[in-house]
Amino acid sequence: MYLSPQEKDKLLVVTAALLAERRLNRGLKLNHPEAVAWLSFQVLEGARDGKSVSTLMNEGTTWLTKEQVMEGVPELIHEVQIEAVFPDGTKLVTLHNPIS
């Protein structure tokens, strides 16, 4: 199986996001890389489910709270940008201040 560099990057994001989700389910707080991966994965899956860019940008600010991440993480993540495949093509989704 051949994977392009972009596909390899997305596979790494998915792997990190699944680990982050397991940790969230156990009540652990996410660190910076885990939080970014988890948010990115939510965007990728939302696009796959047919949600619009604007819907994902609005919902993206409600997915994680300060209580779910380690101290200092919200201040480190001002925005998350991820290219996602939508029914009408690939688009860049930006989540501004995604941790509330």
Curated annotation (Swiss-Prot):
CDD domains according to UniProt: Urease_gamma
A GO molecular-function descriptor: urease activity
Catalytic activity: urea + 2 H2O + H(+) = hydrogencarbonate + 2 NH4(+)
Superkingdom in the source lineage: Bacteria
Pfam families from the UniProt entry: Urease_gamma (PF00547)
GO BP terms in the entry: urea catabolic process
UniProt entry tagged with the keyword Iron-sulfur: no
EC number: 3.5.1.5
Primary localization class, coarse: cytoplasm
Subcellular location: Cytoplasm
Cellular component aspect of the GO annotation: cytoplasm
Pathway per the UniProt entry: Nitrogen metabolism; urea degradation; CO(2) and NH(3) from urea (urease route): step 1/1
Keywords per UniProt: Cytoplasm, Hydrolase
HAMAP family: Urease_gamma
Family note: Belongs to the urease gamma subunit family.
Protein name: Urease subunit gamma
Naturally occurring in which organism (per UniProt): Prochlorococcus marinus (strain NATL2A)
